[in-house]
Protein backbone atom coordinates (compact mmCIF):
# COMPACT_ATOMS: atom_id res chain seq x y z
CA UNK A 1 0.00 0.00 0.00
CA UNK A 2 1.62 3.29 -1.07
CA UNK A 3 2.08 6.10 1.43
CA UNK A 4 0.83 9.60 0.62
CA UNK A 5 2.01 12.58 2.64
CA UNK A 6 -0.75 15.09 3.38
CA UNK A 7 0.22 18.77 3.28
CA UNK A 8 -2.00 21.77 4.06
CA UNK A 9 -0.73 25.10 2.77
CA UNK A 10 -3.73 27.10 4.00
CA UNK A 11 -4.60 30.30 2.11
CA UNK A 12 -1.75 30.80 -0.35
CA UNK A 13 -1.18 32.88 -3.49
CA UNK A 14 -1.66 30.78 -6.59
CA UNK A 15 1.81 31.55 -7.99
CA UNK A 16 3.50 30.43 -4.79
CA UNK A 17 1.46 27.23 -4.63
CA UNK A 18 2.19 26.52 -8.29
CA UNK A 19 5.93 26.89 -7.66
CA UNK A 20 5.76 24.64 -4.59
CA UNK A 21 3.85 22.05 -6.61
CA UNK A 22 6.46 22.20 -9.36
CA UNK A 23 9.22 21.63 -6.80
CA UNK A 24 7.58 18.47 -5.45
CA UNK A 25 6.64 17.30 -8.94
CA UNK A 26 10.16 17.79 -10.29
CA UNK A 27 11.67 16.08 -7.24
CA UNK A 28 9.60 12.98 -7.94
CA UNK A 29 10.39 12.93 -11.66
CA UNK A 30 14.12 13.43 -11.04
CA UNK A 31 14.10 10.53 -8.59
CA UNK A 32 12.35 8.30 -11.12
CA UNK A 33 14.93 9.19 -13.75
CA UNK A 34 17.81 8.54 -11.34
CA UNK A 35 16.34 5.13 -10.48
CA UNK A 36 16.71 4.06 -14.10
CA UNK A 37 20.47 3.84 -13.64
CA UNK A 38 20.29 1.85 -10.41
CA UNK A 39 19.72 -1.87 -9.80
CA UNK A 40 16.28 -2.62 -8.29
CA UNK A 41 17.65 -3.17 -4.79
CA UNK A 42 19.24 0.31 -4.77
CA UNK A 43 16.35 2.32 -6.20
CA UNK A 44 14.68 4.95 -4.03
CA UNK A 45 10.95 4.97 -3.35
CA UNK A 46 9.30 7.95 -5.03
CA UNK A 47 7.16 10.17 -2.77
CA UNK A 48 3.46 10.98 -3.10
CA UNK A 49 1.70 14.08 -1.81
CA UNK A 50 -1.89 15.20 -1.27
CA UNK A 51 -1.86 18.98 -0.94
CA UNK A 52 -4.79 21.01 0.44
CA UNK A 53 -5.04 24.78 0.12
CA UNK A 54 -7.17 27.80 -0.75
CA UNK A 55 -6.32 30.70 -3.04
CA UNK A 56 -7.19 34.41 -3.16
CA UNK A 57 -9.37 35.27 -6.19
CA UNK A 58 -7.55 33.85 -9.22
CA UNK A 59 -8.46 32.78 -12.73
CA UNK A 60 -6.40 30.02 -14.36
CA UNK A 61 -6.53 29.02 -18.01
CA UNK A 62 -5.50 25.49 -18.94
CA UNK A 63 -3.67 24.24 -22.02
CA UNK A 64 -6.87 23.75 -24.03
CA UNK A 65 -8.46 26.99 -22.83
CA UNK A 66 -9.52 30.00 -24.87
CA UNK A 67 -8.80 33.55 -23.75
CA UNK A 68 -12.28 34.64 -24.84
CA UNK A 69 -13.70 32.55 -22.00
CA UNK A 70 -12.43 35.30 -19.69
CA UNK A 71 -15.24 37.84 -20.00
CA UNK A 72 -13.50 40.85 -18.44
CA UNK A 73 -10.54 42.97 -19.50
CA UNK A 74 -7.03 43.01 -17.99
CA UNK A 75 -7.85 46.43 -16.57
CA UNK A 76 -10.93 45.03 -14.81
CA UNK A 77 -8.82 42.18 -13.42
CA UNK A 78 -6.40 44.72 -12.00
CA UNK A 79 -9.17 46.90 -10.56
CA UNK A 80 -10.70 43.88 -8.82
CA UNK A 81 -7.35 42.59 -7.57
CA UNK A 82 -7.87 39.24 -9.29
CA UNK A 83 -4.86 37.27 -10.51
CA UNK A 84 -4.77 35.50 -13.89
CA UNK A 85 -2.42 32.71 -14.99
CA UNK A 86 -2.02 30.60 -18.10
CA UNK A 87 -1.07 27.26 -16.57
CA UNK A 88 0.26 23.88 -17.63
CA UNK A 89 -2.74 21.76 -16.67
CA UNK A 90 -5.40 20.32 -18.91
CA UNK A 91 -8.79 21.94 -19.29
CA UNK A 92 -10.08 25.45 -19.87
CA UNK A 93 -10.69 28.37 -17.50
CA UNK A 94 -11.67 28.12 -13.86
CA UNK A 95 -11.82 30.29 -10.78
CA UNK A 96 -10.17 29.91 -7.38
CA UNK A 97 -11.55 31.82 -4.40
CA UNK A 98 -11.44 31.45 -0.62
CA UNK A 99 -14.03 29.01 0.64
CA UNK A 100 -13.12 26.32 -1.87
CA UNK A 101 -11.21 23.18 -0.96
CA UNK A 102 -8.40 22.97 -3.51
CA UNK A 103 -6.57 19.63 -3.67
CA UNK A 104 -3.39 18.89 -5.60
CA UNK A 105 -2.49 15.17 -5.77
CA UNK A 106 1.20 14.95 -6.69
CA UNK A 107 1.42 11.22 -7.23
CA UNK A 108 3.67 8.71 -8.93
CA UNK A 109 0.96 6.74 -10.70
CA UNK A 110 3.24 3.72 -10.94
CA UNK A 111 2.22 3.22 -7.30
CA UNK A 112 -1.48 3.38 -8.17
CA UNK A 113 -2.58 3.06 -11.81
CA UNK A 114 -0.92 3.89 -15.12
CA UNK A 115 -4.15 5.09 -16.68
CA UNK A 116 -4.90 8.83 -16.79
CA UNK A 117 -8.61 8.40 -17.48
CA UNK A 118 -8.96 5.99 -14.56
CA UNK A 119 -7.02 8.40 -12.34
CA UNK A 120 -9.38 11.26 -13.23
CA UNK A 121 -12.48 9.13 -12.71
CA UNK A 122 -11.14 8.00 -9.32
CA UNK A 123 -10.55 11.62 -8.28
CA UNK A 124 -14.14 12.36 -9.27
CA UNK A 125 -15.30 9.40 -7.18
CA UNK A 126 -13.50 10.82 -4.14
CA UNK A 127 -15.62 13.97 -4.42
CA UNK A 128 -18.83 12.12 -5.29
CA UNK A 129 -18.47 9.96 -2.15
CA UNK A 130 -17.59 12.99 -0.03
CA UNK A 131 -20.69 14.84 -1.21
CA UNK A 132 -22.85 11.80 -0.48
CA UNK A 133 -21.82 12.06 3.18
CA UNK A 134 -23.45 15.50 3.21
CA UNK A 135 -26.61 14.38 1.46
CA UNK A 136 -25.66 15.82 -1.93
CA UNK A 137 -26.24 13.52 -4.91
CA UNK A 138 -23.56 14.15 -7.51
CA UNK A 139 -22.31 12.43 -10.63
CA UNK A 140 -20.57 13.05 -13.95
CA UNK A 141 -21.66 14.92 -17.06
CA UNK A 142 -21.10 13.06 -20.33
CA UNK A 143 -17.97 14.22 -22.18
CA UNK A 144 -17.01 16.59 -19.36
CA UNK A 145 -14.55 16.41 -16.49
CA UNK A 146 -15.40 17.20 -12.89
CA UNK A 147 -18.34 16.57 -10.59
CA UNK A 148 -21.85 17.77 -11.32
CA UNK A 149 -25.27 18.08 -9.71
CA UNK A 150 -28.23 16.85 -11.79
CA UNK A 151 -26.11 16.12 -14.88
CA UNK A 152 -29.01 14.19 -16.40
CA UNK A 153 -31.06 17.41 -16.60
CA UNK A 154 -29.61 19.70 -19.31
CA UNK A 155 -31.35 22.78 -17.91
CA UNK A 156 -30.38 22.14 -14.28
CA UNK A 157 -26.89 20.60 -14.57
CA UNK A 158 -24.40 22.58 -12.49
CA UNK A 159 -20.76 21.98 -11.64
CA UNK A 160 -19.67 21.74 -8.03
CA UNK A 161 -16.07 20.59 -8.53
CA UNK A 162 -13.68 21.49 -11.37
CA UNK A 163 -10.69 19.31 -12.26
CA UNK A 164 -7.59 19.66 -14.39
CA UNK A 165 -4.22 17.93 -14.14
CA UNK A 166 -0.77 17.69 -15.66
CA UNK A 167 0.94 14.32 -16.00
CA UNK A 168 4.46 13.52 -17.20
CA UNK A 169 6.34 10.25 -16.70
CA UNK A 170 3.25 9.11 -14.78
CA UNK A 171 3.66 11.84 -12.17
CA UNK A 172 0.67 14.14 -11.64
CA UNK A 173 0.21 17.70 -10.43
CA UNK A 174 -2.61 20.26 -10.28
CA UNK A 175 -5.96 18.73 -9.29
CA UNK A 176 -9.40 19.91 -8.28
CA UNK A 177 -11.36 22.70 -6.59
CA UNK A 178 -14.50 21.80 -4.64
CA UNK A 179 -16.91 24.70 -4.10
CA UNK A 180 -17.93 24.74 -0.44
CA UNK A 181 -18.46 28.14 1.21
CA UNK A 182 -17.24 30.37 -1.60
CA UNK A 183 -18.97 33.21 -3.41
CA UNK A 184 -19.95 32.49 -7.01
CA UNK A 185 -19.60 36.13 -8.09
CA UNK A 186 -16.28 35.61 -9.84
CA UNK A 187 -17.67 32.75 -11.93
CA UNK A 188 -19.99 35.26 -13.62
CA UNK A 189 -16.94 36.77 -15.32
CA UNK A 190 -15.84 33.58 -17.11
CA UNK A 191 -17.28 30.71 -19.12
CA UNK A 192 -16.51 28.09 -16.45
CA UNK A 193 -14.40 25.27 -17.89
CA UNK A 194 -15.30 26.59 -21.34
CA UNK A 195 -18.77 25.01 -21.14
CA UNK A 196 -21.48 27.44 -22.18
CA UNK A 197 -25.02 27.44 -20.76
CA UNK A 198 -24.00 25.56 -17.61
CA UNK A 199 -23.83 27.06 -14.14
CA UNK A 200 -21.79 26.36 -11.03
CA UNK A 201 -22.87 25.72 -7.47
CA UNK A 202 -21.48 25.22 -3.97
CA UNK A 203 -22.12 22.78 -1.16
CA UNK A 204 -23.64 25.62 0.87
CA UNK A 205 -26.00 26.53 -1.95
CA UNK A 206 -27.13 22.94 -2.42
CA UNK A 207 -27.74 22.47 1.31
CA UNK A 208 -29.18 25.97 1.83
CA UNK A 209 -26.57 26.48 4.56
CA UNK A 210 -24.82 29.69 5.60
CA UNK A 211 -21.50 27.94 6.11
CA UNK A 212 -20.01 24.45 6.31
CA UNK A 213 -16.99 23.13 8.27
CA UNK A 214 -14.07 23.13 5.83
CA UNK A 215 -11.79 21.03 8.05
CA UNK A 216 -14.46 18.39 8.54
CA UNK A 217 -14.99 18.13 4.78
CA UNK A 218 -11.23 17.81 4.28
CA UNK A 219 -11.26 14.80 6.61
CA UNK A 220 -13.98 13.21 4.50
CA UNK A 221 -11.95 13.81 1.34
CA UNK A 222 -8.89 12.21 2.95
CA UNK A 223 -10.91 9.18 4.02
CA UNK A 224 -12.36 8.54 0.58
CA UNK A 225 -9.05 9.24 -1.14
CA UNK A 226 -7.33 6.63 1.04
CA UNK A 227 -10.06 4.07 0.34
CA UNK A 228 -10.38 4.63 -3.40
CA UNK A 229 -6.64 4.91 -4.06
CA UNK A 230 -5.80 2.14 -1.56
CA UNK A 231 -3.30 4.48 0.08
CA UNK A 232 -1.92 5.08 3.55
CA UNK A 233 -2.08 8.78 4.42
CA UNK A 234 0.67 10.35 6.52
CA UNK A 235 0.22 13.75 8.21
Placement of each model-derived feature along the sequence:
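N-terminal lobe of the biotin/lipoate ligase/transferase fold
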Residues: 1-141, 145-157, 167, 211-212
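Solvent-exposed residues in well-ordered beta-strands and their adjoining turns
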Residues: 108-110, 166, 179-181, 206
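C-terminal accessory segment of soluble enzyme catalytic cores
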Residues: 148, 185-235
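Histidine/acidic-rich helix-loop-helix segments that form or flank divalent-metal centers
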Residues: 160-163
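Conserved phosphate/anionic-ligand binding catalytic regions in large, soluble enzymes, centered on
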Residues: 171-184
Amino acid sequence: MPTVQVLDWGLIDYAQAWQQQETLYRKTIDLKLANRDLPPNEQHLTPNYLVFCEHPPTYTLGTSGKYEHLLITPKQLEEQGVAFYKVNRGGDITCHVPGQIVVYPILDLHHFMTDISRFMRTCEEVIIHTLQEYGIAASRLADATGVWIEPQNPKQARKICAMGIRCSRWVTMHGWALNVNNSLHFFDQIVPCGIKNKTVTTMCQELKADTLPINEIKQSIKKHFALLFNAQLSE
